[in-house]
Amino acid sequence: MKFVLLFGVFLVTLFSYSSAEMLDDFDQAAEDELLSLIEKEEARAKECTPRFYDCSHDRHSCCRSELFKDVCTCFYPEGGDNEVCTCQQPKHLKYMEKAADKAKKFGGKIKKWFG
């Protein structure tokens, strides 16, 4: 009976050690994957097209503003035959950002008042 009990304890210890090793390997793999995604995102973020610059080469490359991504808007200038595309912020998103800014400032004032 002692042998079975010791063998059982040995198996449980071995199983817990091996599962801990697998979890560590899994965590390391997940961490490496996350770091590679972050690096790709940083590289992609550097390639964005600023507001009011030409975005005809890639219409999805516009930079983000504080809350929303700018939109590539194309138009024909008066008297011209060539299409011009620039990154712009739609007016409704501009107003939403202003409202969010004012709400943040107002929230800060309320926080000051009530501590």
Curated annotation (Swiss-Prot):
Signal peptide: 1-20
Expression tissues: Expressed by the venom gland.
Propeptide: 21-44
Disulfide bonds: C48-C63, C55-C72, C62-C87, C74-C85
GO MF term (any one): toxin activity
Any single GO CC term annotated in Swiss-Prot or TrEMBL for this entry: extracellular region
UniProt xrefs under Pfam families: Toxin_35
Subcellular location: Secreted
Description of its domains: The presence of a 'disulfide through disulfide knot' structurally defines this protein as a knottin.
UniProt-recorded name of the protein: U3-lycotoxin-Ls1a
